[in-house]
């Protein structure tokens, strides 16, 4: 399989012990997250788990925002009317030719090419 870019909700589910998230993460040998996802996970994590979570996040290829991602995110934001952080995550997947794995069907419909919604809670 290609590279999967995971949305924050899949990682949060994993950290909360959701088995479907654990199963989804094991499907891919090449895993990535946007720097936005990294920030969202770190912002929601407190001591004493912070160091462990930071170490775990190093298992992912962390994608930063460059001018191509920024431009694509602006277009997605304008066309889809979604929040900028979600537009950046989606743009990161598109620009990098990655599969976006999320359960956020409001912003990332499963019918969109390049989007995978593996489970619902």
Which role does the model predict for each range below?
Residues 2-4, 20-84, 88-99, 109-114, ...:
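PIN-domain endoribonuclease scaffold, especially VapC-family toxins
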Residues 103:
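Conserved acidic donor-binding loop of glycosyltransferase catalytic domains
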Residues 106:
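Flexible glycine-rich beta->alpha loop in the catalytic core of nucleotide-sugar glycosyltransferases
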């Amino acid at each position: 399989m290609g590279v999967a870019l995971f949305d924050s909700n899949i990682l949060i589910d994993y950290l909360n012990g959701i088995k479907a998230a654990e199963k989804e993460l094991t499907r891919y040998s090449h895993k990535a997250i946007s720097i936005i996802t990294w920030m969202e996970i770190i912002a929601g994590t407190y001591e004493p788990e912070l160091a462990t979570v930071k170490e775990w996040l190093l298992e992912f290829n962390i994608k930063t925002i460059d001018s191509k991602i920024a431009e694509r995110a602006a277009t997605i934001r304008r066309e889809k009317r979604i929040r900028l952080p979600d537009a950046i995550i989606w743009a990161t997947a598109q620009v990098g030719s990655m599969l976006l794995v999320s359960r956020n069907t409001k912003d990332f419909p499963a019918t969109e090419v390049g989007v995978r919604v593996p489970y619902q809670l």
